[in-house]
Amino acid sequence: MTKQQIQGDRAEEIAFQLLQRKGWVLLDRNWSCRWGELDLVLQKDQRLLVVEVKGRTAQRHDRGGLDAFHSHKRRRLARAINCWRSHHPDAGHQLLQVVLALVNLSGSATRVRWLAIHQLS
């Protein structure tokens, strides 16, 4: 595994653990189709949560991962969500929320910034 893959896995695990403590149940992790990948898909009550995770260290200068979530990435994410829902028709009626988790991996105190995504395309 590359250093970036290790950082990405660590950031996803941190985001997942925080959400799990709040009662979210993991449905899929790193689910992929030809349109893209979904980092985390979780469920709580009758709600679905799709989380795009960006893990960064202090050396990166892309606003903590926010710059990496550009319009092309948002379109790919929207297509991947539609693909996931077509493979999980029982989840089609549930309210869907998409969030971006910006995980700061520098230092001993990990910080996560959560941003709700209201429009993907």
From Swiss-Prot:
Tree of life domain: Bacteria
GO molecular-function term, one example from the UniProt record: nucleic acid binding
Name of one Pfam family that matches: UPF0102
Family: Belongs to the UPF0102 family.
Name this protein carries in UniProt: UPF0102 protein Syncc9902_1284
